Amino acid sequence: MQKRFFLKALVGAAFLVGATAGAYAQDALARIQASGTLKVGTETAFAPFDFIDAGTHAGLNVDLFDEIAKELGVKIEWVLLPWEGVLPGLEAGKFDIVGGPATVTKQRMERYRFTPPVAEATVALLKRAGDESVTKPEDVAGKVVGGGKASAQLDQLKAFVDTLPGKADVREYPGNNEAYADLAAGRIVAVGNSLPNIAFVAKQRPDTFEVVQPPFGTKAYFAYPGLKDDDHKSLMDAIEAAMLKIKNDGRLATIQEKWFGAKFETPDLVNEPAL
């Protein structure tokens, strides 16, 4: 009797251990499918990709991740925080993928795996409307300019002004909205950001802002970064497949036209970024 009881207890314990091990053996995609939720981290000061419209999170990223969610059979849970905390938040496991998006660079590719690109990310300058002192990018020499902290756009702006004969003073802002506010107030003469972003801002406020042509930055693309490890491989594979389907059936172009007024020709993947 005691022997049979001991044997049953041993089998039960083994079952519990096996079940627990099985739960831990699930990779990121399996856990997300089991929970039914994909957690996506982003900021809300990067229009038209992410911004707050009448108290609601809106933008290209919201629309595109809605389509990704349909393909994966899950719902999206947005985790909103300042941009400088987004990539550290990904690595800390606060969410499953960044819905920023971020400029694809060689340095970032060493650390993260990027999805197919969603738009061009070449950097240009935004100035005050009617400011004739800045008619080309080189005109910011010796002046005060600004950009968003911890961004690839800010890095390109700093590199560009270093090439000018009269070095510009580059101010770093917590977000692009703060930089745009200082530009409108005349505290700086230009803001460096990706062309899609500043074109959207200038379109929304044509009496206040104007894009300086041509862009000064290196040709680059925006994509969503995720973790580059075995646990997240199947998740990133699934998101990549979903995004390529969304691109090929025309949904991406429709979303781009909604937010940019035009569609971008982008490669399926950026394997060798210029930056």
Language-model region placement:
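Extended ligand-binding regions for polar small-molecule ligands
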Residues: V62-E71, D131, K143-V144, A150-S151, ...
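Short helix-initiation/N-cap motifs at beta->coil->alpha
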Residues: E77-P88, E132-S133, V170-A185, A220
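Acidic, polar ligand-binding/catalytic clefts
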Residues: K70, K75-D139, P215-F216
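A ligand-binding cleft/hinge motif common to bilobed small-molecule-binding domains
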Residues: G85, A102-E110, Q156-V161, A184, ...
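Ligand-binding cleft/hinge of the Venus flytrap
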Residues: I52, F65-V74, Q153-E172, A202-P206
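Periplasmic-binding protein-like
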Residues: T44, E120-K127, K203-E240, A262-L275
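Ligand-binding clefts/hinges and TM-proximal coupling segments of bilobed small-molecule sensing domains
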Residues: D27, A152-V170, E210-V211, M243-L275
